[in-house]
């Protein structure tokens, strides 16, 4: 997947608008997420490994908030010949267009249905795997429980839900420590103080992370019997829940 360098916040902007997954972001997204999210490549690769283990023949897989299709591609490579369908859903037309190009670059017998839609409007059915890869944190908090419930109801017994998120920590000392570690990670990847500050301002009204306890409670209350964090680096984590 080709990507330009992320310089969206490299110059002083008089008025910072809320972050959007628009054409500008879609064009630099791979570079942006690689330099901003520690462990992203490992998360993507392991999502494919989970697919190999959990996806059952003739079932559906849902990548909710699919962006450029990295998770979908990782899954598709692992489930050839199983007669499954993947539903890759994103509400950004710019992301869907680039995802279409990325998927077309690889031959596969697995059908991918690309949908430009709100993930809250998608019917989940016959699902052996659902992925929410840095997606839930952008939904209004009051909509998150209902989405998890609908996912659970549409999953097959033994199905897996993978949720990757930035985390909020109830302990202020830990929150500050891991925030600082993440900022150092971004600096080490070439982001300036101006870029870091302006992007933080753009995100503050649209991204609201939950704590690990909130995630676990939400999953348990909506029926999932098994839950674990399988990956964490600083304030970013990926979790699995099994029906």
From Swiss-Prot:
Its EC number is 2.1.3.-. The keyword Isomerase does not apply. This is Carboxy-S-adenosyl-L-methionine synthase. Catalyzes the conversion of S-adenosyl-L-methionine (SAM) to carboxy-S-adenosyl-L-methionine (Cx-SAM). Belongs to the class I-like SAM-binding methyltransferase superfamily. Cx-SAM synthase family. It is an enzyme of class 2 (transferase). Gene3D superfamilies: Vaccinia Virus protein VP39. Homodimer. S-adenosyl-L-methionine binds at residues 40, 65-67, 90-91, 118-119, 133, 200. GO terms for molecular function: carboxyl- or carbamoyltransferase activity; S-adenosyl-L-methionine binding. HAMAP family: Cx_SAM_synthase. GO terms for biological process: tRNA wobble uridine modification. Pfam families: Methyltransf_25. InterPro entries: CmoA, Methyltransf_25, SAM-dependent_MTases_sf. It comes from the Bacteria. It catalyses: prephenate + S-adenosyl-L-methionine = carboxy-S-adenosyl-L-methionine + 3-phenylpyruvate + H2O. Keywords: S-adenosyl-L-methionine, Transferase.
